[in-house]
Amino acid sequence: MIRRTSGFSLIELLTVVAILATLVGLLLPAVQAARESARRSSCSNNLRQIGLAAANHESARGRFPVGAESRQWDERPDFPHQFFRWSVLAHLAPYYEQEQLLRSLDLSVPLYVGLSPGDIAPQNKPLVKLTIPLFLCPSDIATAVADLFGPTNYAGCTGSGVDGGSPFETNGMYGINSRTRPRDIRDGLSKTAAFSESILGAGPKATTSPDGIEPATGYGFTFATPLTAAGCGRPFYYNFTDLRGFSWANGEYRTTLYNHARQPNGAALDCLSALMTTPDKSRMYAGYGWRTARSRHAGGAVVGMADGAVRFMADSVDPAAWEATATIAGGEAAPLP
């Protein structure tokens, strides 16, 4: 008696494998898209929480926080005022719902109490090094890019950048010693950008050539202050520190300030400069910048509006509308993107 054993033929097995491979090929992009959708939703929620903290600050103090702080240190009147440098994110510390540790920040002393980058007041040093999930977009690398500081993907909007990227007297919500009130935002809170996102830097790279430097993670440095198209078109140094977003505590264009001088995720390197030679201690070391919104999301970046709402702005947004969204009282006729 011949016994027959059941099983798969080679052709049947290969057919099943091919079907499974096809299913995986169809499902994997959907799974990846779902994960990115969740990450983008989390990123949007972070901006909502930051916007809520700004609203709570305004309710408590009658104005929104400064974008960056610059003032005389009474203990050392000869010290550059820019060394105070506390950012808008730092000034919102008492108003975050879930970040109790940040309420211990001592903002009565400068961020930098000496001339070295490591000269941070002892009471603040362990705090400014913290990596805070609220300040990080989960679509990005979400890791520190500097030894002494915790990173951030989020920045306050200084305006259109048409003033050569100056951080002073800006036409947006935030800037050095800005004290914007709701009534100052004549264009309307729902039509004015307050915060957006950027991409963290990847570490120091080239110092003299743009080769291999991605606009997403690098900068071009120029000696033109205020910034000019010619100066930013041919910077003297490229990506010289590449510390984009290196610190949520630092109020400057490399970290917690941005503007709408260029469209989101633009192909050109963002451009920075520093005011080094002025005798004016209130402005010495101030950074000028044309730094736009950037993200790891496909097709655009998330923007937090002044009323606390969030919007996804496409890379292809009309430049006039993008610029209009940045100003608080420009009276532009361009429709909201």
Task: Annotate each PLM feature.
Residues 4-39, 43, 49:
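N-terminal single-pass transmembrane signal-anchor helix
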Residues 33-337:
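Internal low-complexity, small-residue/proline-rich segments
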Residues 1-10, 71-75:
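N-terminal leader/signal peptides at the extreme start of proteins
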